[in-house]
Amino acid sequence: EISLGLVGSEMCIRDSYLPETSNAKFYFDNALKLLYILNTTTLNTLMLHASVVTQAGNGYAFLGKSGTGKSTHSQLWLRYLEGYELLNDDHPIIRLMDDEVIVYGSPWSGKTPCYKNKQACLKAVVRLEQASENKIIRLRGIQAYAAFSPSCSGMRWQREMADAIHQTIVAVTEHCRLLHLKCLPDEEAARLCCQTIHER
């Protein structure tokens, strides 16, 4: 059975209704994702297009356009930096809770089967860009907002949801470090990113 918790209700659906030989599971999965977004956006909650690693209860999200190397960068952290694990590799969930931004695993993790029912305090968000050398800068204000916003899912044409998305993004920019990393897919990029995130 597939159990789905929605705001104010619960749903239980038998997966035997979804034929393996059709596209039913693909469409059903996307419908659930849409329902989740519709039911949680106004609750200080956003679904991201990102890859997230965690260590000691803290989370670090890597954003970027499709093909930028989010999954690759996460794998570099797992390979070269001690104590990190993958939380989600495609669509993690974030929520503002008591002046902290919490990042959660989700049932949607793209090509990487990483479906963890875990959470962490989101400490930093890094927008990745492919480049010929490794360089990182801290983002603040409107630059931080502009870097984070494109990776947030939601129905922005609906006023109430657009306002909720805006408020949550502002909260993230106030509570988390946001950075822009131009990088190669190498160990140096992972170490530079990690070091900069943890600088005081």
Per-range role (PLM):
Residues 5-6, 47, 119:
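Short aromatic/basic micro-patch
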Residues 69:
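Conserved glycine(s) of the Walker
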Residues 1, 43, 48-50, 57:
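Short coil/loop residues immediately preceding or within conserved phosphate-binding loops
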Residues 73-74:
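Post-Walker A alpha-helix
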Residues 51, 55-65, 79-200:
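Glycine-rich, often acidic-flanked micro-motifs
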Residues 27-46:
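N-terminal pre-Walker A segment at the start of P-loop NTPase domains
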Residues 1-13:
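Short, small-residue-biased leader/transition segments that mark boundaries at the very start
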Residues 18-22:
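Phosphate-centric recognition/catalysis
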